[in-house]
């Protein structure tokens, strides 16, 4: 039976208009089906489109640009399998659950969590450094319902990628992992970040070409942002001229920016402007984004829906920067909400 025959015709047409030109990481038919069901009230739980779910801070590497590198790391406090499943049940309206780290593949229950989410018609993504992606592991990911694997590639040059991540031979391991994932039938994108240097010397374009050579699904990129281990380094940010150059290089939909509405008529952050995205830490802290070290509650203490409503109702989300770029790129936002956090405070900082 055709999709249009299964679902309300008016809502299908609305969904097609809204999601015209989605990133290659999304299956458009599944997105339309999700949108019509969610708008039609067929799903229950908290309102969310994309949940970035940190399930561990543990990682084999220690990258200087890690966006969660300055968060408190106490493995015994990590959410249990049952606690994560409870959050997934509370997130039944979600289109995407993106398991994030640290390195998610270090959790022994990852396959169980992927299966649990996919059985609830949630689209499951996983971010990885690629170290554990063997043929057997990729098959398990596929068999349990993983839809998209993001593998980090920081540089097109093997020795530079290895240096940045502190592990010799990692580039070859990661690119081999990408090939294995694709052969297993998984969608697999290269995940990278842009810097002033890689934009100027052409390395970002070479990462895109590497993705094409590997026949990857696409490239997801992040702008250099003063967060994580870069929290006190605003000089990493691109200038407006550099951003214009980047937009000319990053040809959508093969190349897309993370966590942004991608209809190309807008560059608004999906979290701050659309309330469509948020982050949960491995310890249950609910945050607007993994880049923003502020928490509005913990799922061990309150229902997810209650925390989300409190978070999006906070006055910071009605202020000037909301309909603009990532707030962590905004000097006024950082000065008002980040630089006022008392020194020595463990992050993320509790807002209420």
Spans of features found by a protein language model:
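Conserved alpha-helical substructure of the radical SAM core
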Residues: 2-145
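Flexible mid-to-C-terminal extensions adjoining Fe-S/redox cofactors in radical SAM and related proteins
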Residues: 2-19, 24, 30, 34-35, ...
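Short, intrinsically disordered, charge-biased short linear motifs at domain edges
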Residues: 44, 48-54, 253-258, 274, ...
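Short cysteine clusters
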Residues: 59, 63-66, 269-271, 289-290, ...
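A short acidic, helix-capping loop that chelates divalent metal ions and anchors anionic groups
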Residues: 72-74, 157-164, 227-233
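Radical SAM/AdoMet-radical enzyme domain recognition
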Residues: 81-100, 107-222
């Amino acid at each position: 039976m055709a999709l249009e025959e299964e679902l309300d015709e008016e809502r299908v047409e609305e969904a097609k208009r809204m999601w015209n030109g989605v990133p290659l990481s999304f299956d458009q038919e599944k997105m339309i089906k999700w949108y019509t069901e969610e708008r039609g009230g067929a799903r229950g739980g908290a309102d969310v489109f994309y949940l970035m779910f940190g399930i561990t801070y543990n990682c084999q590497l220690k990258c200087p640009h890690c966006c969660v590198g300055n968060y408190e790391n106490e493995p015994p406090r990590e959410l249990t399998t049952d606690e994560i499943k409870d959050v997934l049940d509370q997130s039944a309206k979600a289109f995407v659950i993106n398991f994030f780290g640290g390195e998610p593949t270090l959790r022994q229950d990852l396959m169980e969590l992927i299966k649990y989410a996919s059985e609830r018609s949630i689209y499951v993504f996983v971010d990885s450094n690629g170290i554990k992606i063997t043929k057997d592991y990729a098959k398990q990911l596929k068999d349990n319902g993983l839809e998209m694997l993001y593998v980090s590639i920081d540089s097109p040059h093997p020795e530079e990628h290895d240096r940045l991540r502190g592990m010799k031979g990692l580039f070859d391991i990661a690119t081999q992992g990408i090939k294995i994932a694709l052969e297993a039938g998984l969608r697999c994108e290269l995940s990278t970040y842009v810097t002033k240097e890689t934009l100027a010397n052409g390395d970002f374009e070479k990462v895109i070409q590497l993705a094409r050579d590997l026949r990857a699904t696409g490239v997801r990129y992040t702008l250099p942002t003063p967060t994580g281990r870069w929290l006190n380094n605003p000089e990493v940010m691109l200038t407006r001229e550099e951003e214009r150059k980047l937009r000319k290089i990053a040809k959508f939909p093969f190349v897309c920016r993370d966590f942004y509405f991608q209809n190309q008529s807008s560059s608004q952050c999906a979290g701050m402007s659309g309330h469509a995205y948020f982050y949960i830490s491995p310890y249950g802290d609910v945050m607007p984004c993994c880049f923003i070290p502020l928490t509005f509650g913990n799922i061990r203490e309150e229902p997810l829906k209650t925390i989300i409503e409190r978070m999006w109702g906070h006055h910071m989300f009605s202020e000037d920067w909301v309909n603009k770029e990532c707030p962590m790129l905004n000097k006024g936002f950082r000065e008002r909400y980040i630089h006022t956090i008392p020194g020595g405070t463990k992050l993320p900082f509790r807002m209420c």
